From Swiss-Prot:
This is Bud site selection protein 14. Disulfide bonds: none annotated. SUPFAM superfamilies: SH3-domain. Residues 111-123, 131-150, 470-504, 615-633 have a biased composition (Basic and acidic residues). InterPro entries: Polarity_Bud-Selection_Reg, SH3-like_dom_sf, SH3_domain. Interacts with GLC7.
Length: 709
């Protein structure tokens, strides 16, 4: 301990040489044994190495700035304060890596030892072996000494011998210089170094790794890139294969080949693992049994009749299947049209360039452009159509004509002969016009919509409306009434539906009539109770006076005296559509008058009635309607002359006396009110209702006679 204090006091005065000699007399003797007995070098070389200013550093600045006696450093072992020339003191921490200190040693010693290493003798290898042996023995003592110092001091220091550092530096420099000179020598020295002690090998390997760390990083960059590229290529290849397999699974489905409303079809194959599942193949049909659950439907497989559950999302219903078929057809047709247009454009462009060559090489197809023209729609009863007949040879031109049986108004033949080196194609077009006959219904505008209230639509006659009316030529020669020409056409259009079936009908006149508005006949209307409502089933489609509630054929309703008029709109429409011509009405009235006279001759009480019946019906109706017209003027405003003329007496009498009294009163009132134009009845109404009232009078007279008897 006294030697160390003397060394510290005399360091600044005696120099580096005296410090090294004092350190050589240290009790432990680590450095002297390393220098004198183990180095194997002569004294000259050892003194040259120790006194070389490039290898020995001056620690005067450290000695001057050493800590005071009261600092924490002096509290521990005083050996830590000794600064020998051959000892390098480096403070370390528990977290410091040994490679960092070794890198610092290499960086300082690499530049200073080039000249010394180049002047060495040939016995360098032997010396290195001796040094390695002593290093192995001394390393154990260093470790033991380090443990003792670390136990005594709280802050331990790393001690490294200068001779050991020099030997290590020489070895590393030899490796570097030999690697620069030739790679072979580098391999030899590296193999010799591998024969060293395992501890030294580990240490040298760590230093070697620290030196070549930067170079390895640069090389690793390229190696890592190559490895990553290979890994990515292999990984992406696998992912690519997986994606291709998934794309194969979700390829667009083929168009449906079977359509059945009662079946379901599997869009994709279903392989259920549960026993309750029904396994289905792609496009396999099945029958739906229960669809109450939104996710699993109970189905029955058609192939073997197995019943089980299948996911509803893979089952395709009939509307969905039909929609998919339509989509496929639309896409297919659009793609074909685009391809055909492109090919047509290409052929046209090529034909414009080499027209002569194209005509000789490319044959014109026989049906080129057939069916691509504009399609027309005809709304009349004459249909024109064309048939194209293709012959294999020019001689075979005789083909059957139209098999439809229609009237051929005109036929035109268009023969096109396509000359080719091998084949000759001939075709001809036959145009035909035919008139369509659909029985008594000559209009094809019937609606296919079926009403919800109809129960048996097959037996009902469809409602047929003619949009164009043809004017009758026979009625033009007959005398016209005071009404307009349009109203006269309406007279000739229909017959009065209230007449009996036994009434004689003129055949010539019947052929000239044309049905304009015909209501369907219900097959179950005979057994149905009549209803007063206009919206009931019994009155749907009946546009005739028989549907009116104010005639004898309507159901009996309580007679109300307050109602002095009938519904105007419906009555006017119904009556205006079923009015007779003047000639027919006069003919029927004459027949009824003769029948009334024959029946009236049976009783004496009906004599006066027979005289009134013999009079003209025009005068009778004027007298009969004069009184109601005066009552109507007091209660209602004058809407129109036709509406006032349709007034009917609601209080129908039950005896002939009441009828005769009303007729007699009407005669008296008609004479006073003939000058009033509003009270004058219309001639059309007289012709319409005169036969009805006459027959009613005759019937009432017969009833009176029966009662009297």
């Amino acid at each position: 301990m006294s030697n160390k204090e003397e060394h510290v006091d005399e360091t600044s005065a005696s120099g580096v040489k005296e410090v090294s000699s004092i350190a050589a007399r240290h009790d432990n003797g680590y450095a002297p044994s390393l220098i004198t007995s183990t180095s194997g070098m002569d004294s000259f070389q050892s003194h040259a190495l120790l006194n070389d200013p490039t290898l020995i550093e001056d620690y005067s600045d450290i000695i001057n700035n050493r800590p005071t006696s009261g600092s924490k450093l002096t509290l521990g072992n005083e050996d830590s304060e000794s600064m020998g020339g051959s000892v390098v003191v480096t403070p370390t921490s528990n977290k410091s890596s040994p490679f960092n200190s070794k890198l610092n040693i290499l960086s300082n010693a690499a530049e200073k030892g080039h000249d010394v290493l180049r002047n060495r003798d040939d016995d360098k290898e032997l010396e290195e072996e001796n040094v390695e042996k002593h290093m192995h023995s001394n390393s154990k003592r260093d470790q033991r000494h380090y443990k003792e110092n670390s136990s005594e001091l709280p802050d331990s220091y790393d001690y490294s011998d200068s001779e050991f550092e020099d030997n290590l530096e020489r070895r590393l420099q030899e490796i570097e210089t030999d690697s620069v000179d030739s790679a072979d020598k580098d391999e030899v020295h590296f193999s010799v170094n591998n024969t060293m002690n395992p501890d030294v090998d580990d240490f040298s390997d760590g230093l070697k790794y620290a030196i070549s760390e930067d170079e390895d990083e640069e090389e690793n960059y390229s190696d890592d890139d190559d490895f990553d590229r290979k890994f990515q290529d292999s990984g992406f290849q696998g992912e690519k294969d997986d994606l291709e397999e998934e794309n194969d699974d979700y390829q667009p489905l083929s168009p449906p080949r079977e359509l059945d409303p009662d079946k379901l079809y599997a869009l994709y194959a279903f392989n259920g693992h549960d026993s309750s599942h029904c396994q289905l193949g792609q496009d396999e049909p099945c029958i739906l049994l229960n669809d109450q659950d939104a996710y699993w439907w109970l189905v029955k497989r058609i192939t073997d009749g197995k019943i089980g559950f299948a996911p509803a999302e893979i089952l395709e219903t009939f509307p969905e299947r039909l929609a998919r078929l339509n989509c496929w057809k639309n896409e297919n047709m659009s793609s074909q049209s685009v391809a055909s247009s492109d090919s047509k454009d290409d052929s046209i462009s090529s034909g414009n360039k080499n027209q002569s060559d194209a005509e000789s090489i490319i044959p014109t197809p026989a049906l080129n452009g057939y069916g691509k023209g504009n399609k027309s729609v005809s709304f009349n009863d004459v249909v024109g159509y064309a048939d194209r007949f293709i012959d294999d040879a020019i001689e075979d031109t005789s083909l059957d004509s139209n098999d439809d049986g229609g009237e051929g108004n005109g036929q035109s033949y268009d023969d096109d002969v396509d000359n080719d080196k091998e084949t000759k194609v001939t075709h001809r077009d036959e145009y035909t016009e035919a008139k369509l006959n659909f029985g008594k219904f000559q209009d094809d505008d019937t609606s296919d919509v079926v009403s919800d209230v109809s129960f048996s639509t097959s037996l009902n006659t469809p409602l047929n409306v003619k949009k164009v009316r043809r004017q009758d030529n026979k009625n033009e020669s007959e005398p016209k009434t005071s009404s307009s020409k349009d109203r006269e056409d309406d007279y000739n259009a229909n017959r009065y539906v209230g007449q009996e079936k036994s009434e004689p009908v003129d055949s010539d006149y019947d052929t000239d009539l044309k049905k304009v508005f015909e209501a369907p006949r219900m097959p179950f209307a005979n057994g149905m109770a009549k209803s007063d409502s206009q919206n009931s089933l019994s009155t749907i489609g009946e546009f005739s006076p028989s549907s009116s509630e104010w005639t004898n054929e309507s159901p009996s309703t309580p007679i109300v005296e307050e109602s002095s008029s009938i519904p105007s709109s419906r009555a006017i429409k119904d009556i205006s559509q079923y009015i007779h011509a003047k000639s027919k009405i006069e003919e029927t009235t004459n027949v009824e008058n003769t029948e009334g006279q024959i029946q009236a001759s049976l009783g004496s009480s009906g004599g006066m009635a027979n005289q009134t019946d013999a009079e003209q019906p025009k005068e009778e109706l004027e007298k009969h309607h004069s009184t109601p017209e005066e009552e109507k003027q007091s209660t209602l405003s004058l809407h129109s002359s036709s509406e006032e003329d349709f007034y009917m007496d609601e209080q129908r009498a039950v005896s002939s006396a009441s009828i005769n009294s009303s007729l007699s009163g009407s005669r008296a009132l008609s004479n006073t009110n003939m000058s009033d134009p509003a009270s004058k009845p219309n001639s059309l109404v007289q012709h319409l209702y005169a036969p009805v009232f006459d027959r009613m009078d005759v019937l009432m007279k017969q009833l009176d006679e029966i009662i009297r008897k």
